[in-house]
Amino acid sequence: KAPEFQGEVVLVTGAASGIGKACVESFLARGCAVIGIDLDNSITSTSSGSNYLGLVCDITNENKFKEVLETGVRYFGGIDMVVLNAGIFPGGKKVSELPTDEWRKVFSVNLDANLVLLREIYPLLQLAPNKGRAVIIGSKNVSAPGPGAAAYSASKAALNQLMRVLAMEWGSDGIRLNTLHPNAVFDTAIWTDEVLTSRAKHYGLSVNEYKTNNVLGVEVSSKDVAELAAEMCGSLFAKTTAAQVPVDGGNDRVI
Protein backbone atom coordinates (compact mmCIF):
# COMPACT_ATOMS: atom_id res chain seq x y z
CA LYS A 1 0.00 0.00 0.00
CA ALA A 2 1.35 3.42 -0.99
CA PRO A 3 1.90 6.01 1.77
CA GLU A 4 -1.17 8.19 2.27
CA PHE A 5 0.37 11.45 1.04
CA GLN A 6 2.58 10.04 -1.73
CA GLY A 7 2.70 12.52 -4.61
CA GLU A 8 1.46 15.41 -2.47
CA VAL A 9 3.22 18.50 -1.13
CA VAL A 10 2.79 20.34 2.18
CA LEU A 11 4.09 23.76 3.19
CA VAL A 12 4.94 24.09 6.90
CA THR A 13 5.78 27.45 8.49
CA GLY A 14 7.93 27.78 11.58
CA ALA A 15 9.39 24.42 10.61
CA ALA A 16 12.87 24.63 12.14
CA SER A 17 11.88 23.60 15.66
CA GLY A 18 9.10 22.47 17.97
CA ILE A 19 5.70 21.71 16.50
CA GLY A 20 6.77 22.81 13.01
CA LYS A 21 9.77 20.47 12.92
CA ALA A 22 7.61 17.63 14.24
CA CYS A 23 5.12 18.35 11.43
CA VAL A 24 7.92 18.02 8.87
CA GLU A 25 8.71 14.56 10.26
CA SER A 26 5.06 13.45 10.47
CA PHE A 27 4.26 14.44 6.88
CA LEU A 28 7.48 12.95 5.51
CA ALA A 29 6.63 9.69 7.27
CA ARG A 30 3.35 9.64 5.32
CA GLY A 31 5.12 9.96 1.97
CA CYS A 32 4.58 13.70 1.55
CA ALA A 33 7.04 16.15 0.03
CA VAL A 34 7.64 19.00 2.49
CA ILE A 35 8.52 22.66 2.00
CA GLY A 36 9.67 23.98 5.37
CA ILE A 37 10.07 27.72 5.92
CA ASP A 38 11.48 29.52 8.93
CA LEU A 39 13.40 32.62 9.93
CA ASP A 40 16.15 30.40 11.37
CA ASN A 41 18.92 29.37 8.98
CA SER A 42 18.83 25.82 10.36
CA ILE A 43 15.65 25.28 8.33
CA THR A 44 17.79 24.26 5.36
CA SER A 45 19.00 21.19 7.29
CA THR A 46 15.89 20.39 9.36
CA SER A 47 15.59 17.19 7.34
CA SER A 48 17.49 15.50 4.53
CA GLY A 49 16.43 13.64 1.44
CA SER A 50 14.87 14.54 -1.89
CA ASN A 51 11.40 14.99 -0.38
CA TYR A 52 12.39 17.99 1.75
CA LEU A 53 13.14 21.60 0.82
CA GLY A 54 14.01 24.06 3.59
CA LEU A 55 13.84 27.78 2.79
CA VAL A 56 14.77 30.75 4.97
CA CYS A 57 11.99 33.33 5.09
CA ASP A 58 10.62 36.07 7.32
CA ILE A 59 6.91 35.48 6.78
CA THR A 60 6.13 39.13 7.58
CA ASN A 61 8.05 40.13 4.43
CA GLU A 62 5.34 39.73 1.79
CA ASN A 63 7.63 39.96 -1.24
CA LYS A 64 10.12 37.49 0.24
CA PHE A 65 7.32 35.05 1.03
CA LYS A 66 6.00 35.23 -2.54
CA GLU A 67 9.53 34.55 -3.81
CA VAL A 68 9.96 31.56 -1.48
CA LEU A 69 6.52 30.22 -2.40
CA GLU A 70 7.43 30.33 -6.09
CA THR A 71 10.72 28.56 -5.37
CA GLY A 72 8.92 25.77 -3.54
CA VAL A 73 6.26 25.36 -6.21
CA ARG A 74 8.87 25.22 -8.98
CA TYR A 75 10.80 22.60 -7.00
CA PHE A 76 7.93 20.22 -6.22
CA GLY A 77 5.31 21.24 -8.79
CA GLY A 78 2.55 22.52 -6.51
CA ILE A 79 1.17 22.62 -2.97
CA ASP A 80 -1.68 20.47 -1.67
CA MET A 81 -1.60 21.25 2.04
CA VAL A 82 -0.37 23.91 4.44
CA VAL A 83 0.32 23.93 8.17
CA LEU A 84 0.36 27.43 9.64
CA ASN A 85 2.57 27.05 12.68
CA ALA A 86 4.85 30.11 12.78
CA GLY A 87 4.05 32.45 15.64
CA ILE A 88 5.52 34.47 18.49
CA PHE A 89 4.56 34.76 22.15
CA PRO A 90 6.42 37.59 23.91
CA GLY A 91 4.06 37.51 26.91
CA GLY A 92 4.51 38.89 30.37
CA LYS A 93 3.08 42.39 29.97
CA LYS A 94 -0.31 43.49 31.22
CA VAL A 95 -2.37 45.59 28.80
CA SER A 96 -1.66 48.73 30.85
CA GLU A 97 2.06 48.23 30.14
CA LEU A 98 1.86 46.82 26.60
CA PRO A 99 3.68 48.94 23.98
CA THR A 100 1.77 49.48 20.75
CA ASP A 101 4.78 48.34 18.73
CA GLU A 102 4.86 44.99 20.53
CA TRP A 103 1.11 44.51 19.94
CA ARG A 104 1.56 45.24 16.24
CA LYS A 105 4.59 42.95 15.91
CA VAL A 106 2.69 40.00 17.40
CA PHE A 107 -0.24 40.63 15.05
CA SER A 108 2.07 41.01 12.05
CA VAL A 109 3.48 37.51 12.63
CA ASN A 110 0.51 35.63 14.09
CA LEU A 111 -2.23 37.13 11.92
CA ASP A 112 -1.22 39.42 9.05
CA ALA A 113 1.47 37.11 7.64
CA ASN A 114 -0.97 34.21 7.68
CA LEU A 115 -3.56 36.24 5.79
CA VAL A 116 -0.99 36.87 3.05
CA LEU A 117 0.09 33.23 3.05
CA LEU A 118 -3.44 31.89 2.75
CA ARG A 119 -4.38 34.42 0.09
CA GLU A 120 -1.31 33.62 -2.02
CA ILE A 121 -1.60 29.86 -1.61
CA TYR A 122 -5.33 29.72 -2.43
CA PRO A 123 -4.89 29.26 -6.22
CA LEU A 124 -2.51 26.37 -5.51
CA LEU A 125 -4.92 24.67 -3.11
CA GLN A 126 -7.65 25.00 -5.74
CA LEU A 127 -5.50 22.88 -8.08
CA ALA A 128 -4.79 20.11 -5.55
CA PRO A 129 -6.04 16.80 -7.05
CA ASN A 130 -7.23 15.58 -3.63
CA LYS A 131 -8.57 19.02 -2.65
CA GLY A 132 -6.58 21.54 -0.64
CA ARG A 133 -6.19 21.31 3.10
CA ALA A 134 -4.98 23.73 5.75
CA VAL A 135 -4.28 23.16 9.43
CA ILE A 136 -3.89 26.20 11.65
CA ILE A 137 -1.94 25.85 14.88
CA GLY A 138 -4.01 27.90 17.30
CA SER A 139 -3.79 27.95 21.08
CA LYS A 140 -5.65 27.20 24.28
CA ASN A 141 -5.58 30.98 24.70
CA VAL A 142 -8.30 31.35 22.04
CA SER A 143 -10.95 30.00 24.40
CA ALA A 144 -9.11 30.53 27.69
CA PRO A 145 -6.80 33.57 27.53
CA GLY A 146 -4.41 34.38 30.33
CA PRO A 147 -3.14 37.58 31.95
CA GLY A 148 0.00 38.98 30.37
CA ALA A 149 -0.80 37.44 26.99
CA ALA A 150 -3.15 40.00 25.43
CA ALA A 151 -1.45 40.33 22.04
CA TYR A 152 -0.88 36.59 21.67
CA SER A 153 -4.39 35.63 22.77
CA ALA A 154 -6.09 38.25 20.60
CA SER A 155 -3.97 37.47 17.52
CA LYS A 156 -4.62 33.72 17.79
CA ALA A 157 -8.34 34.36 18.25
CA ALA A 158 -8.37 36.55 15.14
CA LEU A 159 -6.48 33.88 13.17
CA ASN A 160 -9.08 31.34 14.27
CA GLN A 161 -11.88 33.60 12.98
CA LEU A 162 -10.03 33.94 9.68
CA MET A 163 -9.98 30.14 9.43
CA ARG A 164 -13.74 29.98 10.03
CA VAL A 165 -14.46 32.58 7.34
CA LEU A 166 -12.21 30.83 4.82
CA ALA A 167 -13.86 27.48 5.55
CA MET A 168 -17.09 29.07 4.31
CA GLU A 169 -15.53 30.94 1.39
CA TRP A 170 -13.42 28.02 0.14
CA GLY A 171 -15.81 25.17 0.89
CA SER A 172 -17.17 25.22 -2.65
CA ASP A 173 -13.62 24.45 -3.84
CA GLY A 174 -13.51 21.43 -1.55
CA ILE A 175 -10.75 23.07 0.51
CA ARG A 176 -10.80 22.15 4.20
CA LEU A 177 -9.42 24.30 7.01
CA ASN A 178 -9.23 23.21 10.65
CA THR A 179 -7.54 24.50 13.80
CA LEU A 180 -5.64 22.65 16.50
CA HIS A 181 -5.45 24.30 19.92
CA PRO A 182 -2.39 23.04 21.82
CA ASN A 183 -1.57 24.02 25.38
CA ALA A 184 1.74 23.87 27.22
CA VAL A 185 3.82 22.03 24.63
CA PHE A 186 7.07 22.10 26.55
CA ASP A 187 9.52 20.84 23.91
CA THR A 188 9.27 24.13 22.00
CA ALA A 189 11.66 27.08 21.97
CA ILE A 190 9.65 29.37 24.27
CA TRP A 191 9.80 26.90 27.18
CA THR A 192 13.36 27.29 28.44
CA ASP A 193 14.33 25.59 31.71
CA GLU A 194 14.23 29.01 33.36
CA VAL A 195 10.69 29.76 32.18
CA LEU A 196 9.50 26.27 33.14
CA THR A 197 10.91 26.53 36.64
CA SER A 198 9.46 30.01 37.08
CA ARG A 199 5.95 29.07 35.93
CA ALA A 200 5.90 25.88 38.00
CA LYS A 201 6.94 27.83 41.09
CA HIS A 202 4.20 30.39 40.39
CA TYR A 203 1.60 27.63 40.71
CA GLY A 204 3.33 25.91 43.64
CA LEU A 205 4.13 22.84 41.53
CA SER A 206 7.25 20.89 40.66
CA VAL A 207 8.34 21.05 37.00
CA ASN A 208 7.03 17.53 36.37
CA GLU A 209 3.70 18.33 38.05
CA TYR A 210 3.41 21.49 35.97
CA LYS A 211 4.10 19.61 32.73
CA THR A 212 1.21 17.22 33.41
CA ASN A 213 -1.18 19.71 34.99
CA ASN A 214 -4.26 18.69 32.99
CA VAL A 215 -7.30 16.44 33.34
CA LEU A 216 -5.55 13.37 31.88
CA GLY A 217 -2.30 14.01 33.73
CA VAL A 218 -0.25 13.73 30.53
CA GLU A 219 2.51 15.77 28.93
CA VAL A 220 1.68 17.04 25.43
CA SER A 221 4.58 16.95 22.97
CA SER A 222 5.22 18.58 19.62
CA LYS A 223 4.89 15.15 18.02
CA ASP A 224 1.39 14.75 19.51
CA VAL A 225 0.29 17.97 17.81
CA ALA A 226 2.07 17.15 14.55
CA GLU A 227 0.56 13.69 14.26
CA LEU A 228 -2.94 15.10 14.61
CA ALA A 229 -2.14 17.86 12.11
CA ALA A 230 -1.14 15.21 9.57
CA GLU A 231 -4.21 13.10 10.31
CA MET A 232 -6.47 16.13 9.81
CA CYS A 233 -5.11 16.40 6.27
CA GLY A 234 -5.88 12.75 5.62
CA SER A 235 -8.91 10.70 4.65
CA LEU A 236 -10.13 10.30 8.23
CA PHE A 237 -11.09 13.99 8.31
CA ALA A 238 -12.14 14.24 4.65
CA LYS A 239 -15.58 15.55 5.62
CA THR A 240 -14.47 17.87 8.42
CA THR A 241 -13.89 21.59 8.03
CA ALA A 242 -13.89 24.59 10.39
CA ALA A 243 -13.27 22.27 13.34
CA GLN A 244 -11.38 23.37 16.45
CA VAL A 245 -9.68 20.50 18.25
CA PRO A 246 -7.89 20.92 21.59
CA VAL A 247 -4.60 19.09 22.10
CA ASP A 248 -4.08 19.81 25.78
CA GLY A 249 -4.71 16.72 27.88
CA GLY A 250 -7.96 18.31 28.97
CA ASN A 251 -7.72 21.87 30.29
CA ASP A 252 -10.37 22.62 32.89
CA ARG A 253 -10.77 26.21 31.70
CA VAL A 254 -11.35 25.04 28.12
CA ILE A 255 -13.69 22.22 29.14
Question: What are the functions of these language-model segments?
Answer:
Residues A16-S17:
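Conserved glycine-rich cofactor-binding loop
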Residues K66, F89-R104, G148-A151, I190:
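Conserved mid-core segment of classical short-chain dehydrogenase/reductases
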Residues L118, S155, M163:
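Active-site helix of classical SDR
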Residues P123, M168-E169, A238:
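Alpha-helical segment proximal to the catalytic Tyr-Lys
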Residues V218-V247, D252-R253:
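C-terminal substrate-recognition "lid" of short-chain dehydrogenase/reductases
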